[in-house]
């Protein structure tokens, strides 16, 4: 089953998405997501200039061989651009293989391990009162796992905050220059336990409570934070410190039993090997779009299962609905599943990407349509051209550049 065409589309129906479409000689198509927030054109170029020409004439069934060819054959292995491109190819080929088999992808992977995929939502507020209102709204929607972020008194900007009340959170700023935000660790450490206390006092412990620290703390600060919030029984604290120094997580582990989730910026099993092997984390947050597609994520999840580490894949709406569809199939199958991030998509985005998944009372299901169960409206996508946008950068109050 030869590949005859491989096309790359960059569209911005509210956010920039990079979509790969592979077509076989039989007319069967597969979709893959290659979106890399703020660096979309780099991945699109890598695909268009290097991978797509080398896909033509290959057997679409040989997914593993193609994965290895693009990973080892590039010589310059790993990295977010290379791996996002490989991920899109892999995703599209699995879409094709499942369509040929006339079954949804999760069945091809080995069948469902659960009835539905528990997803967690994002709640925010510029004050504790606003955050509690947003929490209540998502609780009414049926979410069983809820991430909560909140504005911090004395800080003009805080990670996870929308530009205005009632608006969806959008971190990237359109234009040619990233927004600069200020950060104060001490103000954060002093305030955030008050938010969790307010949530638990008002809503109790029925929902799983999550929080994203977004790489902002040093290891000892993260240990202090984790210890200070143990009474609130967090589902996890996410990205407490930059993970390049993986040994530092041992220090955090020594001081707190608050579960740790890490990995949204990882793009291969080698990025998380030590963290998993030494059981320094509880959830691995690698995503299909950045960590090698279905093929790459299977390796990571299988390895993690040996050490009782569960998946908690990154999945905000700066990854396209194609990734979300693929992730739900993967999540329904993978034995050591934990939770799936789900921000939701605008109506405009979903018109470009007609989908087959469903949400019911805190759980999602990918549907039983053959393949990924998602489509791509090329004509509509063409009406939304690429718009430059960049993720923010953070500075301490004295002007020092910090981790965003």
From Swiss-Prot:
PROSITE patterns linked to this entry: MR_MLE_1 (PS00908), MR_MLE_2 (PS00909)
Positions bound to substrate: 37, 122, 264, 285, 314, 318, 341
InterPro entries linked to this entry: D-mannonate_dehydratase-like (IPR034589), D-mannonate_dehydratase_GalD (IPR053379), DgoD-like (IPR034593), Enolase-like_C_sf (IPR036849), Enolase-like_N (IPR029017), Enolase_C-like (IPR029065), Mandel_Rmase/mucon_lact_enz_CS (IPR018110), Mandelate_racemase_C (IPR013342)
Cofactor remark from the record: Binds 1 Mg(2+) ion per subunit.
Keyword Iron: no
Assigned keywords, A-Z: Lyase, Magnesium, Metal-binding
Database matches in Pfam families: MR_MLE_C, MR_MLE_N
Record site feature (Important for activity and substrate specificity), residues: 316
Gene3D superfamilies linked to this entry: Enolase-like C-terminal domain, Enolase-like, N-terminal domain
Alphabetical list of SUPFAM superfamilies matching this protein: Enolase C-terminal domain-like, Enolase N-terminal domain-like
Swiss-Prot/TrEMBL catalytic activity: D-mannonate = 2-dehydro-3-deoxy-D-gluconate + H2O
EC number(s) given by UniProt: 4.2.1.-, 4.2.1.8
Active site: 159 (proton donor/acceptor), 214 (proton donor/acceptor)
Any single biological process term in GO: carbohydrate catabolic process
UniProt similarity note: Belongs to the mandelate racemase/muconate lactonizing enzyme family. GalD subfamily.
Function: Has low D-mannonate dehydratase activity (in vitro), suggesting that this is not a physiological substrate and that it has no significant role in D-mannonate degradation in vivo. Has no detectable activity with a panel of 70 other acid sugars (in vitro).
Protein name, entry field: D-galactonate dehydratase family member RspA
The species this protein was found in: Escherichia albertii (strain TW07627)
Lineage of source species: Bacteria, Pseudomonadati, Pseudomonadota, Gammaproteobacteria, Enterobacterales
This protein's encoding gene: rspA
């Amino acid at each position: 089953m030869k590949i005859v065409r491989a096309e790359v589309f960059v569209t911005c129906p509210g956010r920039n998405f990079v979509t790969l479409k592979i077509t076989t000689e039989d007319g069967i198509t597969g979709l893959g997501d290659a979106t890399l927030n703020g660096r979309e054109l780099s991945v699109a170029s890598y695909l268009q200039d290097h991978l797509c020409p080398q896909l033509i004439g290959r057997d679409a069934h040989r997914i593993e061989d193609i994965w290895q060819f693009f990973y080892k054959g590039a010589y310059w292995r790993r990295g977010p651009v290379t791996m996002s491109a490989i991920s899109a190819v892999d995703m599209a080929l699995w879409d094709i293989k499942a369509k040929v088999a006339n079954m949804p992808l999760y069945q091809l992977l080995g069948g469902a391990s659960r009835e539905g995929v528990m997803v967690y939502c994002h709640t925010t507020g510029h004050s504790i009162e606003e955050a509690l209102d947003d929490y209540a709204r998502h609780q009414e929607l049926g979410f069983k796992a809820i991430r909560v972020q909140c504005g911090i008194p004395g800080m003009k900007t805080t990670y996870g905050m929308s530009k205005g009340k009632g608006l969806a959170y959008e971190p990237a700023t359109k234009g040619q220059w990233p927004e600069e935000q200020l950060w104060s660790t001490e103000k954060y450490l002093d305030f955030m336990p008050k938010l969790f206390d307010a949530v638990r006092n008002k809503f109790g412990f029925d929902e799983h409570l999550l929080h994203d620290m977004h790489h902002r703390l040093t290891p000892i600060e993260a240990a202090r934070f984790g210890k200070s919030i143990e009474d609130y029984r967090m589902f996890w604290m996410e990205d407490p410190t930059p993970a390049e120094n993986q040994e530092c997580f041992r220090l955090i582990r020594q001081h707190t039993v608050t579960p740790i989730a890490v990995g949204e910026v990882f793009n291969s099993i080698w990025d998380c090997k030590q963290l998993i092997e030494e059981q320094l984390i509880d959830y691995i947050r690698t995503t299909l779009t950045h960590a090698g597609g279905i093929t790459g994520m299977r390796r990571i999840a299988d390895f993690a299962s040996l050490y009782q580490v569960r998946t908690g894949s990154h999945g905000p709406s700066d990854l396209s609905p194609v990734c979300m569809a693929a992730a739900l199939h993967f999540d329904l199958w993978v034995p050591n599943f934990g939770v799936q991030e789900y921000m939701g998509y605008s109506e405009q985005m979903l018109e470009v990407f007609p989908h087959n998944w469903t949400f019911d009372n805190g759980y999602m299901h990918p549907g039983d349509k053959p393949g990924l169960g998602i489509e791509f409206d090329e004509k509509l996508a063409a009406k939304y051209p690429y718009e430059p946008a960049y993720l923010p950068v953070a500075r301490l109050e004295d002007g020092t550049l910090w981790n965003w």
